[in-house]
């Protein structure tokens, strides 16, 4: 009889560990999903900023080296 109780206790402990691991896995999965969402958003922002920078570089705005120096008073 004590052996059966021992086995039941071990099974209960293993079930608790599995439940904890399943919960941890679900939390990690959700964190990964959230991070992927943030990463996707950041990639879109980076593409937008790169496009804007390219537009600015190709515009008719002179660079600082091309600007004529201001008159000295």
UniProtKB/Swiss-Prot annotation:
Pfam families: SlyX. It comes from the Bacteria. InterPro entries: SlyX (IPR007236). Belongs to the SlyX family. HAMAP family: SlyX. This is Protein SlyX homolog. It comes from Histophilus somni (strain 129Pt). The gene is slyX.
